[in-house]
Amino acid sequence: MAKRKKLSVWSGIAIVSTAIVTNIVKKKSDKTTYKSVNINPIKKRKKGIYERYIKRVLDVICAVGAIIVFSPVYLGVAILVKFKLGSPILFTQDRPGLIGADGKETVFKMYKFRTMTDEKDENGNLLPDEVRLTKFGKWLRNTSLDELPEAFNILNGTMSVIGPRPQLVRDMVFMNEEQRMRHTAKPGLSGLAQVNGRNAISWEEKLN
């Protein structure tokens, strides 16, 4: 009986992991470059040996280890999201990534567990975020469990374990060239903003 229960748990984990991997691990060619008349090209900085080679290896090791260790958590959260919010389980959002060859930010799909409903008004427009955000969703955000799928962003090379947190694409028009230099480093799962106050700190403190 215990063996059957253990087998069913691992089968569930395998199913969820396969679904996540199928939707998340994509080629870098899937990224697009952000184009805007308000965004000027900036010069890419030269990277050292550590950033070019060693950091990537460490990122992959950490991401794979985290996915294996926390696989029961992935399964549990996925089931809860499905039960409380329905499908899809994952939420995807465009975020600015590394500066491309043309001096402009590439845009990648960042993955999170879904925290909001898809409720719409009578005209078919989504209701405000604060209305659609559920208590369960708030809990996921407060515990950062919604960010677990970002480990797969690390695997496909669009993010790193440590680096500047990616802002929203629409915020880029408000950044000066000095602030946009953050995009010469790969965006991270965690960075200075997270360990120094997270959402409690100001916009300027996050970017400078």
Predicted region positions:
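Membrane-penetrating hydrophobic segments
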Residues: M1-G12
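A hydrophobic, helix-centered structural microdomain
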Residues: G12, V16-S36, I42-D118
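C-terminal terminal-structure detector
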Residues: A14-V16, I20-V21, T184-N208
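Generic alpha-helical structural context detector
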Residues: A78-K82, T115-D118, K138-R141, N153, ...
